[in-house]
Amino acid sequence: PQLPPLCLVTDDLAADHIVTEGHLDHIARVAVAAGFPPHVVLRALTWTPAQRLRLYDRGVVSPGKRADLVLLRGELAAFDPAVVLAGGQVVGRDGTAVYEARSGETGALEGRVDVEAQDEDGFRWRVDLPDGTHRFRAMRVNPRDTYTEAAEIELPVSGGEVAWEARTVLVRVRNRHGGDGVVFAPLLGRDLAEGAVATTYAHDSHNLVTIGTSRAAMAAASATVVADGGGVAVVRGAAGESVAARMPLPVGGVLSARPAARVAEEAGAVRAALEAWGWEHLNPFMSVSTLTLAVSPALKITDRSLVDVVRRAPVGATVGSSTTRD
């Protein structure tokens, strides 16, 4: 039977995955292994996406079209790239870039993480609640996908501050675009060692997101990311005294202008550090970076509030009333 128009695309592939597994070529091989004819896969990688995006000057080898081409080695079904051309110029050969990187092109996009200096005091979770034990909304993550379930946890409040350390993992979102929004939430579903991770690679607003087991570790991780101009950092220890891995992303807080091989090495180190910390997931990068994706069910966190994605509504941090009071 004739298949309907089909696009094969990628989303959220970290640099280490691209270097080791591939990009669209990997998707193509998966599709062929699943039973799709190679010529259908080729069309779904090229012509159909170009038409869908109204990029009518590309997507097919034809006179007058843009010469964005990939020369494949061997059989089509293997989708083994040998030479890559962009605009008619050879830019890659056998998996290696063959063009000279031009300096100075990203300067206008650097220095875009606009937050104050990060210290422990910024990770005090202050609330307008009386002393006692209160029920708070929490986010529960899982080891498979990006679904975050709404949950609850009881935590003590004393002097207007939630005593969360040694009781739960905490996630904080801090606006990094010059705003003053800060939101906290407990995070359930992970048995983590002492430490923290901070990142500005956090869809879709890419604010400064920090997850940790102590205020000191969270401050250390976030300070590392801010010093790098954006990126990802994983720290170990109750005070975050050891940086386990870091991936600077100073271009808009989400990109790097350095060679792919180096970025891939750093991404692999971050992935390994997250897994060693206890962040068990099929894709740790995706799991961490989508806690703020407020269009993905079910409970997400932004710099303005927690969001009930199904109801499309902001929700408060507390659930019901306090259970005890001093």
Where are these regions (language model features)?
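Hydrophobic, small-residue-rich alpha-helical packing segments that form membrane-like cores
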Residues: 1, 8-9
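Active-site microenvironment of metallo-dependent hydrolases
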Residues: 19-33, 39, 43-326
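Active-site beta-loop-alpha junctions enriched in small/polar residues
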Residues: 11-15
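N-terminal intrinsically disordered, low-complexity, charge/repeat-rich segments that act as generic
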Residues: 2-4, 326
